[in-house]
């Protein structure tokens, strides 16, 4: 990961000195180390409380912010206990080493063509977050976790023991618990299309009825889409979805489709990028995890149904990905699109994910 998870304005780890007041980042940078902004928390009582609340997010192992600090806290437990057992009482500092989202590669390479990541404008490729205070605060929790796991090993719960689900189950993530289907055998047999968490736009909360999120739906016994009372649905789209499910029908809004189709002008450029989010930047001005474009495909539909499979289909591929071919890629894009006299595109570009393709074009 990168430091932006903890330091970017969009990350949400900011606190204020009063309601609607000045916002301060939870971490401030000193050299190449990000440290907790304890000084700003002393400005007002409100700031102190707000600071502790934001810091508490780092102490939630299931939050987006607490996962890595929790891992580091367990490492601290193991390291310190091993050192003490060996009679070594030297203090150890604990930092989270992450890639620097502000580092832009300058393109330097050695004699063998390998990237050389020099310090650029005071920015290092790897930066550090000081987690000494956070990992120390985690130690009491780590001890409880160890005791809990030891109790599970000593006396496992029967398979059908009633348990609750929560964010610790990590459904749909790469850390998803492998045992959740054993805890909820009935849920295992619910078809995916009939799951209660399949309402459009990930609608899984019904706050007026005391249910917040997909886990609470399951814990309250609402496992299937039609378990949720129809009267709870307030969105028109959800009502349509439920009606289609209950009656086995389809809903097709031809008027909306026709309105959208009428805006399309020929030729249509069916366009798609392929990218590689490389952790280490490979080419000049790239940053860590930048979506590095290595291929595009273009299919030009000249008129309704008119697209010659030879003349109107183009693919640009940086097959080896070792050389920087972004300039050639951009020129190939320009060469295959038609433009009006004022520089605007002649026709319509269609992409599966418009915001993604637009973002890559802006970066190029």
Language-model regions, residue ranges each:
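Flexible loop/turn segments at secondary-structure boundaries
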Residues: 4-5, 102-104, 186, 276-280, ...
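Conserved catalytic-core segments centered on acid/base and nucleophilic motifs
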Residues: 75-79, 217, 228, 234, ...
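Conserved RNase H-like, two-metal-ion catalytic cores of nucleic-acid enzymes
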Residues: 9-26, 256-343
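Structural beta-strand/beta-sheet cores of well-ordered domains, especially the beta-sheet scaffolds
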Residues: 175, 181, 213, 266-271, ...
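N-terminal accessory regions of nucleic-acid-interacting proteins
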Residues: 200-267
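Cys/His-rich short segments
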Residues: 169-214
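Metal-dependent nuclease catalytic regions and adjoining charged, substrate-binding loops involved
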Residues: 14-69, 76-180, 187, 317-347, ...
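Short acidic loop-to-beta-strand element that houses the catalytic metal-binding Asp/Glu
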Residues: 1-3, 272
